[in-house]
Design a protein with these regions (language model features):
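Helix N-cap motif at beta-to-alpha junctions
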Residues: 131-135, 202-207, 433-436
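Bacterial N-terminal signal peptides
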Residues: 11-25
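Short, solvent-exposed coil/turn segments at beta-strand boundaries
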Residues: 41, 133, 192-198, 301, ...
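Hydrophobic or amphipathic alpha-helical targeting/insertion segments
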Residues: 187-201, 205-210
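Structural boundary/hinge residues at secondary-structure and domain interfaces
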Residues: 28-184, 226-288, 295, 307-423, ...
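N-terminal secretory signal peptides that target proteins for export/translocation
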Residues: 1-11
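A short alpha->loop->secondary-structure connector
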Residues: 145-151, 207, 211-225
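C-terminal substrate/ligand-recognition segments
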Residues: 425, 429-442
Length: 450
């Protein structure tokens, strides 16, 4: 496993906490159903959960970040951010008849959301909430959901399996000026509250399937898949059960393919399809990604462990450059016990991130990717050759005079200028040089012809 040291931008930390704060309520000690990864099916391609949001929020409050947002000087910012978060929630949850504020009224335990691919070309979303201790509030919420959907001119259909409320949303008419717009897709909302669980989704069949296995879970669940097991093993390493976590998981190529089918683009959309290109270039070797976020974890204010699960192709040496095909061979990140900042990095910078990357292999693997993006074979070689041979160009051998002189350490440094303004941010990208004199000469030669 590759180890990276990352300083996280405070803005993202605030996003996590203020989102969870919207869920603040009283939490039950006992779960109403098995952990959601044992409830959602093995066709789940994306998943987010917080098993104990109350403990998660409290752990944040104990950090310096928590103290920062409680500072009176931050009051206006926090208020504005909450309003923006609420507005964003309305845009995303509105079609399900929900708001961010609703999610603060009913949870008594875990909150989880999953993207499921029931069959090729379809993508279903299901929200699962443990409502233990909040059954009455949940019943009221169901009535509020119906009122909101009716206001959106949704049509209530016959209950699915006599217990799941189903609403058909009105289709958005394409603009008369946009003849290339994709055909509008039928959208429905399915809602059910049974026992101590609230299940909301855009596919009544998938909502029914989740409801049916809430007592004992299912054998063919997300947690049973090889990808999820490997991601979880790495993401949870050295994180004890005492740490309340936000966890996430995604099968990036399966999710992208399903999303693309479920949300067709304009008929004449121009430009390359980068997801298809990456798949053709071998990057579909990345089977899954996931992680866990904890606050107040020992010496760390915030700890985020992210895992990319990309096993070598069958029969390939895991340590070989050729463990993947084509451009995906550039996915080589050497092991490192730790990565320390360069000596010249100031102590007062606002952020610092660093990793190790085999730049030489990446360069040698880039040809097919560049050609695929451009749509013409030989483009990459032509550009490299022209930089070396064109009498009006810099006449540099990119691989020998530059790439071969670079090390494997890459660093991103964030800082700001005062007084603080909208354009105060500064960013430096630094790459280790093992032959700095030759690198300087090559860069100087290239700039001289610019």
């Amino acid at each position: 496993m590759n180890n990276y040291i990352v300083r996280v931008n405070v803005g993202w930390v605030l996003v996590f906490h203020l989102t969870v704060c919207c869920l603040g309520t009283t939490w039950a000690a006992d779960s109403a159903f098995p952990e959601s990864q044992n409830v959602f099916p093995d066709t789940t391609v994306a998943w987010i959960n917080i098993a104990d949001p109350d403990a998660f929020s409290k752990s944040f409050d104990r950090t310096q970040y928590g103290k920062l947002i409680r500072d009176p000087h931050m009051e206006a910012f926090v208020k504005s951010f909450r309003e923006q978060l609420s507005k964003a929630g309305k845009q995303r949850l509105g079609k399900l008849g929900l708001t961010i504020e609703d999610l603060g009224q009913v949870p008594g335990g875990e909150i989880a959301i999953a993207a499921i691919v029931p069959e090729a070309g379809r993508l279903a979303t299901v929200l699962l909430v443990d409502t233990t201790g909040h059954e009455e509030e949940t019943k009221q919420l169901l009535d509020e959901i119906e009122t909101r959907l009716v206001e959106q001119k949704a049509e209530r259909l016959a209950d699915y399996e006599k217990k799941i409320r189903v609403y058909r949303l009105p289709q958005e008419s394409p603009s008369a000026d946009n003849k290339d717009a994709a055909e509008p897709q039928e959208q429905v909302v399915a809602v059910v509250h049974e026992g101590k669980a609230l299940v909301v989704g855009d596919d009544p069949v998938q909502v029914s399937h989740v409801l049916a296995v809430l007592e004992n879970g299912r054998e063919d669940c997300l947690a049973s898949t090889e990808q999820f097991k490997n991601v979880s093993k790495g993401a949870l390493k050295n994180l004890g059960p005492e740490n309340s976590k936000l966890r996430w998981y995604i099968d990036p190529f399966a999710f992208a393919a399903a999303y693309k089918s479920a949300h067709p683009a304009n008929k004449r959309q121009k430009g390359p399809d980068y997801v298809e290109i990456l798949g053709r270039q071998g990057f579909d070797a990345v089977k899954a990604m996931g992680g866990a976020i904890v606050f107040d974890a020992g010496p760390f204010q915030m700890r985020h462990q992210t895992i990319v699960y990309a096993p070598p192709l069958p029969g390939r040496d895991p340590l070989s450059v050729d463990r993947y095909d084509l451009a995906a061979r550039m996915l080589r990140f050497p092991e490192s016990e730790e990565i320390q900042p360069f000596d010249w990095v100031p102590s007062g910078v606002s952020s610092w991130s660093s990793l190790k990357w085999d730049i030489q292999t990446a360069f040698q693997s880039a040809e097919s990717l560049v050609d695929d993006v451009v749509g013409e074979k030989g483009v990459f070689d032509d550009v490299i050759a022209s930089l070396k041979e064109d009498p009006d160009g810099p006449q540099i051998d990119v691989e020998a005079d530059l790439v071969a002189c670079l090390g494997k350490k890459i660093t991103l440094i964030g800082d700001f200028e005062e007084p603080i303004d909208v354009d105060s941010d500064r960013l430096v990208i630094a790459i280790e040089a093992i032959d700095p004199e030759k690198v300087a000469a090559t860069v100087g030669k290239s700039m001289a012809t610019d």
